[in-house]
């Protein structure tokens, strides 16, 4: 459907209707849907209503509980061993079954809107996914879900049901309109519209003007012009018109707000107009008025289009609750109530629990089953009260009249309902061609929007081409001897290597988009082949440009065979290699699925195809039983093809007899173990294209069938599995008898005439805006006092968070005017961070710590040094009890939205992290967002108790219930544009605030029982202000309230007599040594539990070590000719470069993730960044030493180096130094760059330089003088030098060199490779120097560079 200023499709059809003209009101929408319904009835068109039934639905998961669930390295090893033993039927896995949904039975009727209520962790998401047929395959499901009697399964038509996730995953590069439009194309046209369209085609004559408008709309929607029309309608009803053409954005791109992203997530599925909708916590991030608007539109659609809707909301306000027809109350997986909304309170009243008159019914329903809250609603004799368990409620419901009431009142009789079977409509099925077109057009769009990435790659390959072409410049390139051919061989190999490396960027690009693909695969049925084929087709011109650029810049400059045919054939090989490379790394990303795993697989694959490709060690020197590996490496075919193309040219036909060859060209091919016949060129090229085809096919299967690696999961306690009701009483907020009282100083905060500006966005100039600055806060003044809880409220865009950031000193940009005083003295940020806490909305924590460890770390560094450790631990326990985290003490924090704590648990942890610092002033940004009513009440009780201790607390809050709103003492209300419109006390039952606004002429009076917060936000909206014809900011500045506040500001802005300004002698509570110890303790805890990172690198090190040992088996024991030296040089080269680079690449995501936490902790004044940096470096050392031990212990004896203590020591030492500088280099690049993608790109670019100038591809003696300085600036070259000379520098065996007399190994090293004894000590010293330099740069950049923008 469509509704906008103009409902215009791609084909130019326009349907401007009087009932869809902007703005789209509820009456407009109802009128449109009503006329559409009447039209269907006249034409006899209509889709079957869908009744959804649950029949004893049980969903179970096998989980590990207790400490064994914590993913430490030891637990991972034990768990893996148990899994293997269980597979061999030697033991059980010791997992425990946990029921997520327990025998849920019920009927969800069509043409009605059902509200699903329940606390986070109650099983709401699992139930909704079960209803939508989207359950994860790892879960065990019993019972069944049916649509009109037919069981839901994978063959159920996609258009029948839609699941809206609670997580907002979108392409940052697409606009809101493009995002919803793509979903529309993938979901297809609504079946009813198809039938209507067919009826209209057959209809003769025109009934009236309204029919004409409906007909034109339906035709446009049905016959290929309707995607924009459908999209526009959804955009309109969701209130997204203002941002429809704005990029969604992410942490790197400015985009829409969190609330707008949530609405885009809803629109993404709503646009398909399925028959059943299952929506999961869709009000998170939305204010109450926006939530009401959206729910009202959804109600009209459910009633007038006969849809079946089940929607879960966290904190539905009363006016929103009244829009629902039915309620399902889910507690710990059991349905406690399912029936009409109006009967819900009656049911609980029959059990002795009554909802108070001013209590939100939704809040009552969620609290009445809680052991902590239940007693307050008991209406019987207080002495006879006993806790009613969830099982008792559920059993009472099952035996009540309500289930039978629902059964008797469903939409049709059972027989009639079953006759309307749900059948797949072939006309609704989207053709493969249309799916491909939609995907391809989106990929073209993303390619354009990501053009900076491809421009960067083009610049990168241009720079590398210029380097390589000047390194192998034709004026220095001869073609008379085998040594000359060796130099050309190095240039050819380098071309293959760089083209292959260029394809590695596919890993990061693919990993970045996989979470969105998994979501769209699940909810849009996006097939893997559609995405992969689109990406593949668009990769062809990319390969053409990049390999064409490389070939054009290097071929004739280096001086390869001058024939144009040879030039084209050289290009074809590199093009095929580039395609193979992109396909390979795309495939590895698809099976790795996480950045760490994909980087590991990519590096392992690179090492394997590199080592087995025939250049590092020739085919003839491989063990006979390993030569099959040579033919499995794509490098083999690329290297053979480019070598054949070059060395079979006539200019290499100089007569030369060696190794059964007659020319120089044939000799180099024979010596290198390469093919010598021309027909192999085309075979090799064909095989490269074959590799590409195979990897693309495998990628399709991986995308289609592999599960998402981060399915949302929460921590499971053993108590939950046993359903221990006593666990619910933990954390009831009551003070313990041995309460620890930590001293703090009550402080007031005054801010006067605060103005905040940012530079005007460039996009605004397009609309004629000439101002250079955009003002976000306008002359805001106020005061926050000890013992007073203040609410900072306003509609979206009013500047609430901006004001908090300015007052807390968290803004990193913009221009601030005005004064801020603490206890009458000007605010100093250094001291303010010591006495304040800031609970950010984003809940940023280290994912690999437990809850208790997170609190220990915060308290360790933020409490005064004179607080003893036992006092600190007791205080932490009290805070955990206060915010109900005691039961989650040993739970992993995890990644937000993926693993670990749920959203509300993370929110409580955020508050606890600040409370353990015992601050005097606390700022809280949206502390109840994402929480259900009960969790929000717990949080606000915690806040209230904090205020009652004499602290100053300010909260921004979105959509508070009556109870939560009236727990505040004072209110600061702002309107859009950053202007203050009310500042003062709320009064009993919000009477002061209500009295103030009702005194303004034109303001509608509050309705009886209406939430004062919702009423206040409604009347203060821009639309309401315009309709009334007032400016609230002007009215406030003329009011007596304003002058009362001015007097308060003046009074609090003066210091109290006999007081001094805050002063803390040291900059931090703890000294530098304690900071280092605390940071190292935290990093050690996090690393020990980061099993993915550490297990991956240990396994990879072991696998690579075994591969090196097998491939280079005993090559160091005997040296007979030049090729034997090159083979040893190959293993040294591989040891010096690849494992170190693997460490660098898999470390970067870990450091990048912790850097975000660093910004929060640094802003809180917890520690010096130097302490953080030292801990980050130090924690890597033991894990790195283990890697070096594994590698050295395996590789050294297997490759046959001389077994002397001295030589083994030098080998191990250089490996330690190599690992160390690679590790530090990875950290340094993260600290120097704003994100991991740029850090990875920079690392790759530098790694190529290190690779080229390492002394393997071209020896130091052969490097042109203008590039020789790079060799001496290259740490990888030093490692190759040190390893090679320490092992072979004293070898005196005579070896054969083609075209030269016999010479000793030492003479060959000095003459050809430039390895001399006099430089050995220098090389060792340079290792220490580069490690010190990288460490210094890491410390410096982490201290002074901050890429967070607020």
Curated annotation (Swiss-Prot):
Annotated ranges, domain ABC transporter: 85-357, 749-1001
One Gene Ontology MF term: ATP hydrolysis activity
Gene3D superfamilies, A to Z: P-loop containing nucleotide triphosphate hydrolases (3.40.50.300)
Ranges for region Disordered: 1-23
Described purpose of this protein according to its UniProt entry: May be a general defense protein.
Protein name, per record: ABC transporter G family member 45
TM stretches of this protein: 453-473, 491-511, 523-543, 557-577, 597-617, 683-703, 1099-1119, 1126-1146, 1181-1201, 1208-1228, 1238-1258, 1269-1289, 1322-1342
Keyword annotations from UniProtKB, A to Z: ATP-binding, Membrane, Nucleotide-binding, Repeat, Transmembrane, Transmembrane helix, Transport
Native organism: Oryza sativa subsp. japonica
GO cellular component terms, A-Z: membrane
